[in-house]
Amino acid sequence: MKNMIALTGIGYDIHRFAEVPRPLMLGGVHIPSSRGLDGHSDADVLCHAIADALLGAAGLPDIGYWFPPGDPSCKDIPSLDIVAKAVSLIRERGGRIVNVDSSLIAESPRISPYLEQMKGALGAALGISPVRVGIKATTNEQLGALGRREGIAAFAVAAILMPEDLTMP
């Protein structure tokens, strides 16, 4: 068996609310809201932050490299597919996901009623138990663009195990 090394990565994403009607997706779950987020994909900030955390932990390029914003094939794709791609890239290199932890920052809508559903969707995409998926929701205390309800942001941290020989110079 190969020696494995624990690695961590951090991800962040922010999207403004769309000017045109579209669904609000967070953590792969449709959240009832009068406003969705603007973006090339489904604009799921939580999935994007988690994918970037995973890619960063593995020392791989960020999601913009794998899913360029101007690429028509990426238009409106489900962001759980972006998470699945990050997981696939890690597994192709002999790695595995240990856990993720994240925070959503939004004044509205109220997110807490959907946290368990998000953990289930993300756990399935990550190939881990939902108990290893942390999601917290907080506000920006009415400060800045997020406080003015102009958008939603997310931070995420991911822990992965990778073969040690892949991490050596």
Swiss-Prot record:
Pfam families linked: YgbB
List of residues binding a divalent metal cation: D13, H15, H48
Enzymatic class: lyase
Gene Ontology terms, MF aspect: 2-C-methyl-D-erythritol 2,4-cyclodiphosphate synthase activity; metal ion binding
Cofactor, free-text remark: Binds 1 divalent metal cation per subunit.
Site (Transition state stabilizer): H40, T139
Enzyme Commission designation: 4.6.1.12
GO BP field: isopentenyl diphosphate biosynthetic process, methylerythritol 4-phosphate pathway; terpenoid biosynthetic process
UniProt cofactor(s): a divalent metal cation
Catalytic activity as recorded in UniProt: 4-CDP-2-C-methyl-D-erythritol 2-phosphate = 2-C-methyl-D-erythritol 2,4-cyclic diphosphate + CMP
Pathway: Isoprenoid biosynthesis; isopentenyl diphosphate biosynthesis via DXP pathway; isopentenyl diphosphate from 1-deoxy-D-xylulose 5-phosphate: step 4/6
Record key words, sorted: Isoprene biosynthesis, Lyase, Metal-binding
Binding site for 4-CDP-2-C-methyl-D-erythritol 2-phosphate: D13, I14, H15, H40, S41, D62, I63, G64, T138, T139, N140, E141, R148
InterPro entries: MECDP_synthase, MECDP_synthase_CS, MECDP_synthase_sf
Family: Belongs to the IspF family.
Physiological role: Involved in the biosynthesis of isopentenyl diphosphate (IPP) and dimethylallyl diphosphate (DMAPP), two major building blocks of isoprenoid compounds. Catalyzes the conversion of 4-diphosphocytidyl-2-C-methyl-D-erythritol 2-phosphate (CDP-ME2P) to 2-C-methyl-D-erythritol 2,4-cyclodiphosphate (ME-CPP) with a corresponding release of cytidine 5-monophosphate (CMP).
Subunit (UniProt): Homotrimer.
This protein's name: 2-C-methyl-D-erythritol 2,4-cyclodiphosphate synthase
Record organism: Akkermansia muciniphila (strain ATCC BAA-835 / DSM 22959 / JCM 33894 / BCRC 81048 / CCUG 64013 / CIP 107961 / Muc)
Gene for this chain: ispF
